[in-house]
């Protein structure tokens, strides 16, 4: 399935039905009073999150949603039926903006979260409402109100606990494929991962968390080089960053500092997140890892996803951080990974 993380959508709520001009007509009541019914309300437009959706792809094929108008009122004081509402399904993590103003209307992060996005117009009143002692046969009624309409900009930020960050070929896709059921494309050339991948890591019977693998970052990503910048927003919601560096990197320290620099250029808040360093591909070397990053106390883990080396320790460490971060109130800024 193609991954799409932004879309524009036009939504229009239904207009209200027109009020009716009618007079009571019965066999023995030749001059009955007004009995025009009210028009029905136009259908609302709602947005609702669905945890089974992971992309905004559907909006590339359908980007206009128009609710039904209310039915017009009828005689005998019959109110028209309300218009059928429209419920638009979006993935969890969708940010909704008014395209005209840029205002954030909603940030939908919970499953089955439902918000009213465009309100249907009120039905017009029938002529029964306009009779007075001096004007007993009104021949006018109200039109229905117009339904609200907007163009919305939708932006998806994936909901994950762990964000995997690193240069191309650092082993991110291999790791997520081993510890979860995700099956990203894996090959020995740069930028094999072209879109983010999500995987659910389950272990020890009851522990589980969501891991996101994004395309590799290269130096200059913040200026648009490579693919990583396009998808960095998908790790903004994560609770912990795992920075992956291959053990055969020419300069692990320099690579680490480059990654931190690109993250900071994109958003300084990314460096406030807890982080760990994961040295990958330990199966290609017989040398024990002896590494201390200058000026850092960030935990370092050495793993081989292929051989299964160090994975239990890595998952345990990530789980401890996730549990601690889940306990942090949402209005409290998390501490950095120092």
UniProtKB/Swiss-Prot annotation:
Alphabetized UniProt keyword annotations: Cytoplasm, GTP-binding, Hydrolase, Magnesium, Metal-binding, Nucleotide-binding
The subcellular location is:
Cytoplasm
Q: Boundaries of each Obg domain copy?
A: 1-159
Region annotated Disordered sits at 123-145
Q: Kindly list the cofactors needed.
A: Mg(2+)
Q: Which residues form the OBG-type G domain?
A: 160-323
Q: Which Enzyme Commission number(s) are on file for it?
A: 3.6.5.-
An MF annotation (GO) of this entry: GTP binding
Name the InterPro entries for this protein: G_OBG, GTP-bd, GTP-bd_Obg/CgtA, GTP1-OBG_CS, GTP1_OBG_dom, GTP1_OBG_dom_sf, OBG_GTPase, P-loop_NTPase
Q: Which GO terms describe its biological process?
A: ribosome biogenesis
Enumerate the residues binding GTP.
166-173, 191-195, 213-216, 280-283, 304-306
Pfam annotation, one family: GTP1_OBG
Keyword flag DNA damage: no
Q: Pull one GO CC term from this UniProt entry.
A: cytoplasm
Key word Magnesium present in the record? yes
- The enzyme's main class, written as a single word, is hydrolase
Where does the chain bind Mg(2+)?
A: 173, 193
What does the subunit comment say?
Monomer.
This chain's function reads:
An essential GTPase which binds GTP, GDP and possibly (p)ppGpp with moderate affinity, with high nucleotide exchange rates and a fairly low GTP hydrolysis rate. Plays a role in control of the cell cycle, stress response, ribosome biogenesis and in those bacteria that undergo differentiation, in morphogenesis control.
Q: Which family does it belong to?
A: Belongs to the TRAFAC class OBG-HflX-like GTPase superfamily. OBG GTPase family.
Q: What is this protein called?
A: GTPase Obg
Origin organism of this chain?
A: Chlorobium chlorochromatii (strain CaD3)
What's the gene? obg
